Amino acid sequence: LTGLIARLPRARTTLILALSFLLLAFAAHASAQRVQPHRAAHAQPHAHTKAVKKTPHRKKKAVKRRRSRVTHQAAQRHAAPASQQRRAKRTTAVRPPAPAKPKLLASCGYTPRAVASLHSRAAYVLDVDSGTPLLARNARTVRPIASISKLMTAVVARDADRPLNGVLRVTARDRDTIKFTGSRLQVGSELSRRDMFHIALMSSENRAAAALSRDYPGGRAAFVKAMNREARRLGMRRTHFREPTGLSPRNVSTAEDLARLVGAAAQDPLIRYFSTDLSTTVRPGDGELVYVNSDPLVRYRRLPIRLQKTGFINESGHGVVMRMRVKGRRETVVLLGAPTRAGVSSDAIKIHRWLSCSIQ
């Protein structure tokens, strides 16, 4: 081969170049085989390290995303009241006009001439729901109120919280020593406190009212003091009581003050019921006594009355206080000083007609 190469100089050069190229290629391949396992050995720890590092990083991101979602949900839950507050503020900012206060209308017959034609010398009408006086005629004039006093008697006796089924006996101290009026309840008669309340309010039984006041802790004198104390508490500045029945003309008040008393009494369901009951039968001894309501407007169901009390002595004239419901509204009506019972009833019916027509 050497001799052949010597003979062929050009071929020798070419062959040398080819052999050199093959040797270089073989050396490069062998070097690559040695380096590749070394790189693989180093690549595996790095890959593991990266995987270890990435795994908690992803978890942290996932936790952050979950926390973000929880925080967002909590924010949404707490955002509702804030939005409601904003809506409330917007609602408050744009308030609808206040409803017009009720009033009696001339188109319904309420005129100065009609008021002047009332039989009652003093009259007062109060719309309870709005606190608006609708009619006031001599409403602050002090005058005797007669048996309307028994409404305060009932309020104070009820506040004493004595057992209603307890028995009271009528004594000589319960007789009328002012007007010397009679009574169907004889001295020695016994009735429950419930029956005494019932006939004192419904039929204006004087001895029943007197017995309730005598039964008060401290006696009748303490009871009358409690009546005046309650009047002051209610703001009845022109009111004074001397005794519990109303027989004394020195039991005085005004139509405006009595509207306050009606408001206090109307809070007691028992007083409302007893004052508007039509009739009842009591048994003070061996026999029976039938009592009827002293107010003809209640007896004949002429008006939607929820509470009432009548009163009459010569010094006071005829009077009545009542709580009515007219078209869903509570109305207090006080009438004092009418010359006849028919006159005060006529005034009440007329005022109810004005109310029914005027209230929308």
Role assignments for model-derived ranges:
Residues 120-122, 294, 318-321:
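Short glycine-rich loop/turn motifs
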Residues 94-256, 260-269, 326:
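Active-site-adjacent loops and short helices of periplasmic peptidoglycan-processing enzymes
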